Structures are given as structure tokens and as C-alpha cells.
Amino acid sequence: MSLNLEEKKAVVAEVAAQVAAAQTVVVAEYRGIAVEDMTQLRVKARKEGVYLRVLKNTLVRRAVADTPFAGIADQLVGPLAYGISKDPVAAAKVMHEFSKTNDKFVVKAGAMPNFLMSPKDVGNLASMPSREELLSKLLGTMQAPIAQFVRTLNEVPTKFVRGLAAVRDKQAA
């Protein structure tokens, strides 16, 4: 089904809006994938907050022109699925994990603002923890000394109470 000029402009505007807010764009070739597999990928992408679409390459070229992702335009050849994400890791993680389980889905390239990534770089990015995981690790690291200090302070009255209980038990016996 061919799109008319107004529909194409709407698609370009929609993709341009997604790219403007994005931290990562990942491109993958999808030749010969079953519909149910692609549906599973879309469900997982939606759950992770990744904008996943199959688009005409010329429309995407227009959408990324004059953006920090313009370098990816040279990689847009063949039937491609586009993953666009505000989270720097989410699109890479979703698409890389899917490519592990489906050999007909091949990650071709990725981009971060003003940086083009190879498929290997996308795999490395996918292996990184998400922003939430990194923040929770940082918080745990910052909180550990304080928690240990509080436990140490709590130990003094606890030992005192145990000593009183031992004296009471000895006198009661």
C-alpha cells in the first residue's frame, strides 16, 4: 500500500519528533521473519518504551536529516526495522536480545547523538545495565557506609540490654 504525499509528511513528522527526543536509534534488517515473531518484538519494545517501526528508508532519511542522528542515513539499505528510544540502552537491548533468538533479524547499525555505532557497539551497549539499575547501584553504594554506621551505633545499646538480661536471668536462677 502506497502512501500519498500528506501521509508521507505525517510519517516524517512523527519519526522526526521521536528522533528529536531520542538518545538511541538502532537499525536492524528483518528479512524472512514470521509475523508472530515480529509481533512479540513489538510487544517487548512497547513494554520497554521503545518506538519500533518498519518504515521506508527514504522517509527516515528525511526525518533524521539535520539532526544529531544524520550519520545513520548511510546505513539505511534494505528492509529495516527502526528502534528509537529515550533510554540510551533500551532500544539496543530489545533489538539485540531479539537478534540472539532469531537469526533472520540482524542488527545493522545504531546511533547516539553525533556517534554512529557498529553492530558490535550496539551489542556492547545492550550488555550495559539500564539507567535505573545504575542509579540503584549508586544509591546502594552511597547508602552502605551510613547503614553500617547506624548498625554499629545500635549495637552498643543492644549489648547493654543483653547484659542486663543476663544479670536478671542469673539473679532469677
UniProtKB/Swiss-Prot annotation:
A Gene Ontology annotation in the biological process aspect, one of them, is: translation
- Annotated signal sequence range: none
| Keyword entries, A-Z | Ribonucleoprotein, Ribosomal protein, RNA-binding, rRNA-binding
**Record keywords: Ribonucleoprotein included?**
yes
GO cellular component, alphabetical, reads: ribonucleoprotein complex; ribosome
Q: Can you provide one Gene Ontology molecular function annotated for this UniProt record?
A: large ribosomal subunit rRNA binding
Is Ribosomal protein tagged as a keyword?
Answer: yes
Disulfide-linked positions = none
What Pfam families has UniProt attached to this entry?
Ribosomal_L10
- What InterPro entries would the database entry show? Ribosomal_uL10, Ribosomal_uL10-like_sf, Ribosomal_uL10_bac, Ribosomal_uL10_bac_type
**Assembly description:** Part of the ribosomal stalk of the 50S ribosomal subunit. The N-terminus interacts with L11 and the large rRNA to form the base of the stalk. The C-terminus forms an elongated spine to which L12 dimers bind in a sequential fashion forming a multimeric L10(L12)X complex.
UniProt family annotation: Belongs to the universal ribosomal protein uL10 family.
Q: What does this protein do?
A: Forms part of the ribosomal stalk, playing a central role in the interaction of the ribosome with GTP-bound translation factors.
Q: What is this protein called?
A: Large ribosomal subunit protein uL10
Q: Which organism is it from?
A: Thiobacillus denitrificans (strain ATCC 25259 / T1)
The encoding gene: rplJ
